[in-house]
């Protein structure tokens, strides 16, 4: 994936593509020119690793010529990678006309009348008690239940500063604090503080995402055992989870911000728009 290649070809210090990469004693990688920006050792005869504080003397620092050649190749291939990973419009033939399942909504979540939008509030809602409902985590599931085939849906995240969307196993424990992780049965992407995007791998995978991200396309392919996320603003690829298990049903997952009580941080499921225009079938709920 494009973001994978770029992430693994980037300087640990400046986060740009590596230029004349070098290794420190501990294996830390950075650009040769970034060495001058690293903290000096107390004796002044070496530099400290920003991660582990191991001292590297001048003679310890090794140039990574093979890595430099690899990074050059990755940079040259980036336009092709981005083109290959641009969203295929034909995914939309699998679009699902779903709504939010109110019976799963945690009681601080407000669900719109059309059952497509959700935001968090400090006021507790008076809803019936049921085992399907999340408590205490501010989450809600989509009405669809996926066991096979391909499925696609779109979510407007708008200007929300914090959110998580994706899929989860139907069997997840909803009566405990939710920790988003593949190991826990969640395959999601999300954002914190308007700027830190991450995928729910273990450990988390930080994502390079357009900060103007407004609308996300999600494509679940149970034939290939994968779920992919796309920025619908420019069609670029955000992240793909591979080798997801298919031993039980999946549900669409949504969690709006709960750290901004004075603002309505709304996320919304997009309705299917006039499928007859394309003369193509649309998946039922």
Swiss-Prot record:
UniProt cross-references to Pfam families, sorted A to Z = PRY, RDM, SPRY, zf-C3HC4_4
Please tell me one Gene Ontology term that the record gives under cellular component: cytoplasm
Q: Where in the cell is it found?
A: Cytoplasm; Nucleus
Source domain of life is Eukaryota
Its BP terms in the Gene Ontology are: innate immune response; regulation of gene expression
Start-end of RING-type zinc fingers: 11-53
Q: Which residues form the B30.2/SPRY domain?
A: 78-276
**Keyword annotations of the record:** Cytoplasm, Metal-binding, Nucleus, Zinc, Zinc-finger
CDD domains with a match to the protein in the record: SPRY_PRY_RFPL, vRING-HC-C4C4_RFPL
- By what name is this protein known? Ret finger protein-like 4A
Tell me the lineage of the source organism: Eukaryota, Metazoa, Chordata, Craniata, Vertebrata
What is the gene name?
Rfpl4a
């Amino acid at each position: 994936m494009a973001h994978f290649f770029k992430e693994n070809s980037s300087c640990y210090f400046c986060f740009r593509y590596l230029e004349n990469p070098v290794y420190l004693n501990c294996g830390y990688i950075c650009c040769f020119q970034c060495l001058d920006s690293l903290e000096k050792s107390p004796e002044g005869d070496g530099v400290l690793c920003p991660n582990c504080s191991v001292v590297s003397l001048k003679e310890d620092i090794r140039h990574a010529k093979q890595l430099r050649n690899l990074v050059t190749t990755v940079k040259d291939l980036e336009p092709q990678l981005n083109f290959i990973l641009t969203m295929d419009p034909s995914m939309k033939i699998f679009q699902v006309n779903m709504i939010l399942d109110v019976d799963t909504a945690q009681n601080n979540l407000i669900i719109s009348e059309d059952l497509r939008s959700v935001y968090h509030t400090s006021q507790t809602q008076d809803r019936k008690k049921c085992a399907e409902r999340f408590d205490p985590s501010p989450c809600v599931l989509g009405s669809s239940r996926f066991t096979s085939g391909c499925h696609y849906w779109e979510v407007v995240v708008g200007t929300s500063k914090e959110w998580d969307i994706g899929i989860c196993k139907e069997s997840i424990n909803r009566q405990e604090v939710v920790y988003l992780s593949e190991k826990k049965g969640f395959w999601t992407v999300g954002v914190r503080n308007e700027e830190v995007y991450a995928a729910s791998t273990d450990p988390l995978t930080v994502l390079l995402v357009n900060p103007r991200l407004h609308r996300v396309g999600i494509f679940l392919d149970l034939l290939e055992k994968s779920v992919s996320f796309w920025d619908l603003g420019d069609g670029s690829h955000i992240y793909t989870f591979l080798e997801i298990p298919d031993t039980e049903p999946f549900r669409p997952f949504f969690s709006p911000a709960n750290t901004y009580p004075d603002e309505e941080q709304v996320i919304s499921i997009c309705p299917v728009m006039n499928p007859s225009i394309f003369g193509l079938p649309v998946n039922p709920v």
